[in-house]
């Protein structure tokens, strides 16, 4: 059963960061527009490199199982924060769905922070007791 669990965690680690890696890449390639949008929403533009680091870098870290527990905690917190900053105006149609999506994603990352990266991960290779 342990092997099935490890494969399941690996599949989750592959699926969960897809949104973050693609969103981070979009922010890299559309830096100026993203910075303007953030500032229009009241978030200082100087925060964008940190957002990119968390989305793109954190997404890759989760994908490969590197610093998984810590990255998953930061990503869960970031996702909750973005839910409240960018999706809490439920009068705008899709925001309630986006808000709930972010809550769900945060739950997945919290679960990953608790369970760890599984056997098929860089963390496992670096430290046998993940």
From Swiss-Prot:
Report the locations given in the UniProt record.
Cell inner membrane
Q: Which residues lie on this side of the membrane: Cytoplasmic?
A: 1-5, 67-70, 123-130
An example Gene Ontology CC term for this record: plasma membrane
The UniProt keywords, alphabetically, are:
Cell inner membrane, Cell membrane, Membrane, Transmembrane, Transmembrane helix
Q: Where are the transmembrane segments?
A: 6-26, 46-66, 71-91, 102-122
Membrane topology of the entry: Multi-pass membrane protein
Highest taxon listed in the record's lineage: Bacteria
Chief location category: membrane
Which segments does the topology annotation call Periplasmic?
A: 27-45, 92-101
Pfam families per the UniProt record, alphabetical: DoxX
Keyword Cell membrane set for record: yes
Which family does the similarity line name?
Belongs to the DoxX family.
Could you tell me which PANTHER family the record lists for this protein? Answer: INNER MEMBRANE PROTEIN YPHA-RELATED, OXIDOREDUCTASE CATD-RELATED
- Which protein are we looking at? Inner membrane protein YqjF
Organism whose genome encodes this protein: Escherichia coli (strain K12)
Which gene specifies this protein's sequence? yqjF
